[in-house]
C-alpha cells in the first residue's frame, strides 16, 4: 500500500509542477505580448512601413520622397523671404494680394 501512495504523491507533484510550469509560461507569454504592444506603439509608423515594404525598391522610393520633402521644407523660408522683399519693393502689389483695394 505504501508504494501506491508514494506513486500517487509523485503523480500529483508531477501534475502540480506541470501546471505551475504552464502558468509561468503563460505569464511570460503575456509579458512578451505586452512588451511587443508597447514597442509597436513606440515605433508606430516606422514598423508599418518596414512590414509593408516587400522589397528594397519600395523602401528606397519612400526615402527619396522624404528627401524631397526635406528639400521643400528648406526652400520654404527662402521663398518667403523673396516674396517679402518683392512686397517691400512694390507696396501696391502687396495690398492687392492681401485683398485690400489699391
Swiss-Prot record:
Region of interest called Disordered, as start-end residue ranges on this chain: 1-102
N-acetylserine-modified residues are where? 2
| UniProt keyword annotation of Phosphoprotein present | yes
Sequence positions bearing Phosphoserine: 2, 5, 13
Q: Where is the composition biased (Basic and acidic residues)?
A: 13-37
GO cellular component annotations of the record: nucleus
Give the top-rank taxon of the lineage listed in the UniProt record for this protein. Eukaryota
* Record-linked InterPro entries: Pro/parathymosin
Positions bearing Phosphothreonine: 52
Keywords in alphabetical order: Acetylation, Immunity, Phosphoprotein
Positions modified as N6-acetyllysine?
4, 15, 92
State if Acyltransferase is listed as a keyword. no
Enumerate composition-biased segments (Acidic residues).
38-76
Q: Name one GO biological process term.
A: DNA replication
Molecular functions (GO terms): histone binding
UniProt xrefs under Pfam families = Prothymosin
Q: Which residues cross the membrane?
A: none
Q: Which family does it belong to?
A: Belongs to the pro/parathymosin family.
Q: Its biological function? A: Parathymosin may mediate immune function by blocking the effect of prothymosin alpha which confers resistance to certain opportunistic infections.
- Name of the protein in question: Parathymosin
- Gene source species: Homo sapiens (Human)
Q: What is the lineage of its organism?
A: Eukaryota, Metazoa, Chordata, Craniata, Vertebrata
Encoding gene, per UniProt annotation: PTMS
Amino acid at each position: 500500500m505504501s508504494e501506491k501512495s508514494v506513486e500517487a504523491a509523485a503523480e500529483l507533484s508531477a501534475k502540480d509542477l506541470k501546471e505551475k510550469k504552464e502558468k509561468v509560461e503563460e505569464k511570460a507569454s503575456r509579458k512578451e505580448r505586452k512588451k511587443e504592444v508597447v514597442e509597436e506603439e513606440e515605433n508606430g509608423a516606422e514598423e508599418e512601413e518596414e512590414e509593408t515594404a516587400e522589397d528594397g525598391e519600395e523602401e528606397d522610393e519612400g526615402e527619396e520622397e522624404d528627401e524631397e520633402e526635406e528639400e521643400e521644407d528648406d526652400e520654404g523660408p527662402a521663398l518667403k523671404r523673396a516674396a517679402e522683399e518683392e512686397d517691400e519693393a512694390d507696396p501696391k502689389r502687396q495690398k492687392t494680394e492681401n485683398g485690400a483695394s489699391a
